[in-house]
Amino acid sequence: MFLPLKPFVYFDPKDWLGSQLSEPGLEAKMDAAWSQTTGSKRSETMQETMQDIFDGEMLQNFKGPDGKHFGHKEDEGHYVFLLSIDFFNPLLNKQAGKMVSVGIISLVCLNFPPDIHYKPEHMCLVGIIPGPRETLLMIINHYLTPLVDDFLDFWHPGVQFSQTDGYKHGRVVRCAIVCVVCDLPAARKTSGFRPSSHSHFCAICHCTRQIQGYNDTDYHLWRRRTKEECLASAKAFYEAESKSEQGMAYASSGIQWSELLRLPYFDQTCFVMPCTIYSLVSSINISKIY
């Protein structure tokens, strides 16, 4: 009999979503969120100022497994999620206290009305990453594996719920993780990018410390990374037959494998973003949103 060195507490997002879909009136509001996307009456008269993620270009053009827009279909529920991973000291951050770090993996359904996105009763606590130290990049993949497995089922063929609030005879539901929001170190770990101290310090473009450095602000000359390039670099790292090959693949791109790349729609170049509050607290001024 084997005992785990570190037990990982995981909560099934399918069970959680089933409970949310049973709440009176909530399912209809979740379906209505797609009214802001391409082809809808709202999108034709939309103002330039965006009010919700559904106003953004990515979800306006996001396609499902059938190659068509992922928006609401009458016979299926199509929902998108924000993934967050954060580490904290459960013993509180005291000046003379112990340095302990425990992580949480959580989901927010972006189809919920914005005013309830972050209410505890409407957030999904997926897992608790055990301490006592913050998890390394390659180890965090093991904690993401069951979540990715569940969302592969959600993507195709979808998950059949026997009954929901609006569909007494059941309904197929498809879901996708379209946004990863963490502080900068956790965002890079989760998506497979190395820390900003690496030679390839940028997750958006191909700038390096040796050539452009940190002071080059002529962004018109920066070459943006593409989804295909990042995926090829991550696969080269994953399929390497030795540590030396992995080191070469990593050194040339600054990218390692992330479990999220098993999701066929996941795009490292636009799905991952540092949490806004950390940027503001760190006095980081953003002059252009990419």
Describe each model-derived feature in a short phrase:
Residues 61, 67, 73-133:
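Acidic, metal-ligating active-site segments
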Residues 6, 125-138, 187:
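Short interface patches used for recognition in eukaryotic signaling and trafficking proteins
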Residues 56-71, 149, 180:
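A short, flexible low-complexity segment enriched in Lys/Arg and Gly/Pro that occurs
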Residues 94-99, 120-122, 138-142, 190-192, ...:
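Short coil/turn segments at secondary-structure boundaries
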Residues 75, 79, 130, 134-145, ...:
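Intrinsic disorder
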